[in-house]
Structure formats: structure tokens, C-alpha cells
UniProtKB/Swiss-Prot annotation:
It comes from Xylella fastidiosa (strain Temecula1 / ATCC 700964). GO terms for cellular component: cytosol. Monomer. Binds 30S ribosomal subunits, but not 50S ribosomal subunits or 70S ribosomes. One of its GO terms (molecular function) is ribosomal small subunit binding. Belongs to the RbfA family. This is Ribosome-binding factor A. One of several proteins that assist in the late maturation steps of the functional core of the 30S ribosomal subunit. Associates with free 30S ribosomal subunits (but not with 30S subunits that are part of 70S ribosomes or polysomes). Required for efficient processing of 16S rRNA. May interact with the 5'-terminal helix region of 16S rRNA.
Length: 125
């Protein structure tokens, strides 16, 4: 029985991410927020809360983006309630997803560690 509940939370997470993605894009246009996208949604087992992870296209404006979404959380939740067929829509908690920034930083570090192939040929030849 618990496995079924887990599958339901996954389905709801996917639906919230899809619907909220469209609402966030509209909020970006309407309220002048920095460009961002919804990268992931985690819903608690009791479906009372949802962590919404967003990625800002301009990392330096990420705090402004998350603050803007937190201010619009109630309005976004009401929009979700109109589109989703749930008795209770989870309370939305917005967080900045820094996984892209961390991945880029790791990629840069790895690139700095590995010498380019052209430099190796010049030294040996």
C-alpha cells in the first residue's frame, strides 16, 4: 500500500511541475521577474507541502527570482487549484536550484585539470 502512495506523489509532482512551469513563465512576463524555469518539484507524502526548485537564467538574480515567486505563492497555488483535480493543493515553498551552477563549476575545474590535446603534441614533438 505505501508504494501506491509514493507513485501518487510522483504523479502529482510531475503535474505540478508541468502546470507551474507555465504559470511561472506567465508571472515572469506579467510581474517583470527574472527569467526562470521550474526544474523539480518534491511533494511530501501527506501532500500538504511541495518544494519547488527553480533555476534562474541569470544566476546573479536568483535571490530576486525566488523572492518574487515567494510573494506570488498564494496566487500560483490558486491557479494550480483551478487546473488540478485535487481536493487539496499543496502549499508551495520555492527554492533556488543551484545544481546547474555546481555542475558548471565542476566542469570548469575538470577542464583546468586536463591539458588540451594540442599542448601535449607540441611538447612531445
Amino acid at each position: 500500500m505505501p508504494k501506491k502512495s509514493f507513485q501518487r506523489t510522483e504523479r502529482i509532482s510531475v503535474q505540478i511541475r508541468r502546470d507551474l512551469g507555465a504559470f511561472v513563465q506567465a508571472a515572469v512576463r506579467d510581474h517583470g521577474l527574472p527569467s526562470m524555469s521550474v526544474s523539480d518539484v518534491e511533494v511530501t507524502r501527506d501532500m500538504a507541502h511541495a518544494k519547488v526548485f527553480v533555476t534562474a537564467l541569470q544566476a546573479e538574480r536568483s535571490f530576486e527570482a525566488v523572492a518574487g515567486l515567494k510573494a506570488l505563492a498564494r496566487e500560483l497555488r490558486m491557479q494550480l487549484a483551478q487546473t488540478m483535480r485535487l481536493r487539496f493543493v499543496p502549499e508551495l515553498h520555492f527554492h533556488y536550484d543551484d545544481s546547474l551552477d555546481r555542475g558548471e563549476r565542476i566542469d570548469t575545474l575538470l577542464r583546468d585539470l586536463i591539458p588540451p590535446a594540442d599542448a601535449e603534441k607540441d611538447e612531445s614533438g
